Structures are given as structure tokens and as C-alpha cells.
Amino acid sequence: MLDIHNPATDHHDMRDLTIIGGGPTGIFAAFQCGMNNISCRIIESMPQLGGQLAALYPEKHIYDVAGFPEVPAIDLVESLWAQAERYNPDVVLNETVTKYTKLDDGTFETRTNTGNVYRSRAVLIAAGLGAFEPRKLPQLGNIDHLTGSSVYYAVKSVEDFKGKRVVIVGGGDSALDWTVGLIKNAASVTLVHRGHEFQGHGKTAHEVERARANGTIDVYLETEVASIEESNGVLTRVHLRSSDGSKWTVEADRLLILIGFKSNLGPLARWDLELYENALVVDSHMKTSVDGLYAAGDIAYYPGKLKIIQTGLSEATMAVRHSLSYIKPGEKIRNVFSSVKMAKEKKAAEAGNATENKAE
């Protein structure tokens, strides 16, 4: 978990921008606020920053972020925070924004489930997919008593699967990634997918097929989990059934179900903002249907949208940049070059240190 050294100050204090959501997009937006010399406050519903990357996939490796050939999810989150932290953004954790009000002077109040009200000149919604919960296998009934001990919906620690017989359900990126990722640690890995081909990234799918060909893993396509067996609250077997009626039984200690998540906008759906399916419609400036209220990341929609981390980081940059004309109306917006800004900050810091040393 990230060590946050700058918790929010008095919630009555005005900030230039309220950022709803502390995932990668929200954190990078805070950095961009610092780059553009505006103050911000991140409000995150979870007990830590990082969104799904920190809460669900901290050990998952990511390969499609510019400049990182390969990076564990939690390391990416920590790197993003290291960038943002230098500008001391306020951070509010464990609070969910339930309502916003646009005042007559054009500023905003955002109210959370705790009753706190936060004030800002503009708002950026970077809440990812909203509230999310894993998709389950309805045919298994209520298996909540096994969740976190034998049945998992995400990999938070590889140690949970070390030396275990693991059955993975799914055919997308997460299922394929962890099929490959757990080979070295698990006693055995069995992948079960109800489709006839994988939907995950081609490179990873090729690695899975190669592992299957050399006998490292077992793969069952066009097959579903029919039922499971347990003994004294511990998983022992997984029963499979194929589309042609064939049946198999696999000895197992862990069932890892990776078939996606159900998202829910929650209070956001009642905010009288233009929606497209389960996302907020934005224009080319990342502005929603309300002036002064922007959206970025997975929660934002426009034609041709790609829901990947890289896109969210770019959208955060655009949203903050374009919010300046609303936050500081009439002021000329100048391009900010990071190398120039950092050099000036470093020079100012050195000058300050020299002055302190001279005074001593």
C-alpha cells in the first residue's frame, strides 16, 4: 500500500480541481495539476490509491505502457504516485462521492458518503469503471465461504497459489496472463474456457498454446465448470463439462475465476450527465455535458475510445490542460515543457537551500 504523506487538509478549503478516483488516471491527473500550477484534491473510495491495479492485480505484469517493457502493476502505481507526490496533492481515502452541486458562481461542491463537502473550481471524474465486482459462476451457487481460501477472483499474491493445483477459468487477458504467470509457482495449472478460442492478447495466447503443447499445462476449450467438491471447507475437485457432453474431474486446491467484472456507475448514473452505455460522454476537450466537469480514463466515452492505461494517462493530461480555461478564465494558457519546469524547480530549490545555509 502506498504511504501517503499528504492527507487532505480542511475539506472546506477551495481547490482548483477535485479528482474523483485515485487509479492511474486520477494519480496522473494530480501530477498534471502540479505541472500546470493548479491545486487539486483526489477523492478515492478505497483505502489506498491505485484503483484495480492496487486492489486486484498488484503482482500482475503490464506490458503496454510507454517506457516500461514490463512492469508489475503496483510498481506502476508507485511510480505514478512518485510523480504526483512532488506537488503535494490532497488525498482523501475511504470516501465515495455521492453528489455534486454546481453553484451560481460556477464552482463545485462534491459531497461524499461521510457527509463531507469538498469545494473546487472544476471537477475531473476518473472513477474507472465505477464500482465493480467480479463475475461469478452461477452454476456453483453460493461459494462465498470458500472465497479467499480456495476460490479467488483475482491474484493479489502469488504466494496464495504456490505449490497448489490451480484451475483457472476464463479466456481473456487476465486468465491467460495468470495461466502463464503461475506455471513456475503452482504444482499444476489447468485452464478452462467455454469458448473455442482465446480472447486475450495474441502473444500471451501463443505462450499458453506452447505450454499446452509441451505438457506444462492442461487446457480445456468449449468447456465449463459444472460443479466443485469440498471437504471441511477446502476445495478438493473441480468437475468439468464440455459442449459435447464430455465430463472430466480435476483434482484442485485453488479455483481462480477470471471472467471479468460487472461495473456499476452507482451515484454517477444519477448525476444528469450524458451517458453512453456505462460511461460519460465527453468532447475533444474531455468535457462532459456540464461545463467545468470533465472525465478521463475508462469512465469517459467518445467514438473510437480504447480502454487501456495509456489512453487514460493521455486523457488525464488533456482534461487538466483544458480545465485551465474554466479554472482561470481569461488567462493565457501556455505550453508547459516538463524539462524546463523541472529545471526551474531544481534551481529554485538550490537557491532556497543556499539562502538557508547562508542564514545559518
From Swiss-Prot:
Its UniProt entry gives the catalysed reaction(s) as: 2 reduced [2Fe-2S]-[ferredoxin] + NADP(+) + H(+) = 2 oxidized [2Fe-2S]-[ferredoxin] + NADPH
Where exactly are the transmembrane stretches of this chain? Answer: none
Work out whether the entry's keyword set contains NADP. yes
Determine the domain of life of the protein's source.
Answer: Bacteria
Binding of FAD occurs at: 25, 44, 52, 57, 97, 132, 298, 339
Q: Which keywords appear in this protein's UniProt record, sorted alphabetically?
A: FAD, Flavoprotein, NADP, Oxidoreductase
Q: How is the cofactor bound?
A: Binds 1 FAD per subunit.
Q: Which cofactor does it need?
A: FAD
Look up the EC number in the record and give it.
Answer: 1.18.1.2
What Pfam families does UniProt report for this protein, alphabetically?
A: Pyr_redox_2
Question: Which InterPro entries does the entry mention?
Answer: FAD/NAD-bd_sf, FAD/NAD-binding_dom, Fd--NADP_Rdtase_type_2, Ferredoxin-NADP_redctase_2
Question: MF terms per GO, please?
Answer: ferredoxin-NADP+ reductase activity; flavin adenine dinucleotide binding; NADP binding
The entry's family comment says:
Belongs to the ferredoxin--NADP reductase type 2 family.
List, alphabetically, the HAMAP family matched. FENR2
Q: How does it assemble?
A: Homodimer.
Spell out the protein name for this chain.
Ferredoxin--NADP reductase
User: Which species is this UniProt entry from?
Assistant: Chlorobaculum tepidum (strain ATCC 49652 / DSM 12025 / NBRC 103806 / TLS) (Chlorobium tepidum)
